[in-house]
Amino acid sequence: MSNVLELTIPASTANLGVGFDSIGMALDKFLHLSVKETSGTKWEYIFHDDASKQLPTDETNFIYHVAQQVASKYSVDLPILCIEMRSDIPLARGLGSSASALVGAIYIANYFGDIQLSKHEVLQLATEIEGHPDNVAPTIYGGLIAGFYNDVSKETSVAHIDIPDVDVIVTIPTYELKTEASRRALPQKLTHSEAVKSSAISNTMICALAQHNYELAGKLMQQDGFHEPYRQHLIAEFDEVKTIASQHNAYATVISGAGPTILIFSRKENSGELVRSLNSQVVSCHSELVDINISGVKERIVYQ
């Protein structure tokens, strides 16, 4: 029998308000993949959660498509594979489910194609496919990361930021919000003065996080001009959640990625009460505390 590739891939939250398409943080929700060669004639999928059972099992499957794309880039052929999948990451909720699947697909191609990619190369590939590093970088490395993708040189640069000493709460609505629909809400252009203002806020927020000044960082996280003002109306619960969080003296309430999940930076002494208040008052969502993931994707080979 063939060896089994086991992957544990974290979720991620992008933007942190003012870091549009550049800042992301890994979270302890996971996509679990167990992959091995099979004697069948086409790739097989075994889904262990209800959400994943919605995914296609033909060549339109995202993991299949990306794995074959990577294999083609390095001129290797992949064997017929069986993929077992279980995910804690809700689909189309702004928690990086597609980035987790993308990173998983690259690892699958790397192992079964014997490509020998470095982690740096995995990052470059993932960002080139995704178009921005805000989800894929923390998914690969863990922690909180700022990054930039140069779409001319096709190079990605990242910088790691200290893990914030806050409690993280995610409020997850029951409905999906596709990234494409969320991006359509954004303006095509910003004035020079608007761009300068938002850039200055983002720069200062990063410095505040680096100095562990969460009061200032949280204040600035909520002053985005790139995307939040144009997306908040797509999330019916946003204002109510922000009000409740403010009543519990939270540092910041922002959209997670493209939404509809809402991300809260909470004071540790208030987080439990805040989560309970959210779950009792905002019944259309599920709120929970989630740890910041510091390890990134984990790979394990089971020899058979």
From Swiss-Prot:
Its Enzyme Commission number(s) read 2.7.1.39
InterPro entries named in the record = GHMP_kinase_C_dom, GHMP_kinase_C_sf, GHMP_kinase_N_dom, GHMP_knse_ATP-bd_CS, Homoserine_kinase, Ribosomal_Su5_D2-typ_SF, Ribsml_uS5_D2-typ_fold_subgr
GO terms (molecular function) for this protein are:
ATP binding; homoserine kinase activity
Task: Report keywords, A-Z.
Answer: Amino-acid biosynthesis, ATP-binding, Cytoplasm, Kinase, Nucleotide-binding, Threonine biosynthesis, Transferase
The pathway to which it is assigned is:
Amino-acid biosynthesis; L-threonine biosynthesis; L-threonine from L-aspartate: step 4/5
| Keyword Nuclease applies | no
Binding site residues for ATP: 90-100
**Example of a GO cellular component annotation carried by this entry:** cytoplasm
Instruction: Report the SS bond pairs.
Output: none
| Pfam families in UniProt | GHMP_kinases_C, GHMP_kinases_N
Q: Which SUPFAM superfamilies match?
A: GHMP Kinase, C-terminal domain, Ribosomal protein S5 domain 2-like
Q: Which reactions fall under this protein's catalytic activity?
A: L-homoserine + ATP = O-phospho-L-homoserine + ADP + H(+)
Q: Where in the cell is it found?
A: Cytoplasm
Q: Which family does it belong to?
A: Belongs to the GHMP kinase family. Homoserine kinase subfamily.
Q: Which PANTHER family match?
A: HOMOSERINE KINASE (PTHR20861:SF1), HOMOSERINE/4-DIPHOSPHOCYTIDYL-2-C-METHYL-D-ERYTHRITOL KINASE (PTHR20861)
Q: What job does the chain carry out?
A: Catalyzes the ATP-dependent phosphorylation of L-homoserine to L-homoserine phosphate.
Query: What protein name does the entry list?
Result: Homoserine kinase
User: What organism does the record attribute this protein to?
Assistant: Staphylococcus aureus (strain JH9)
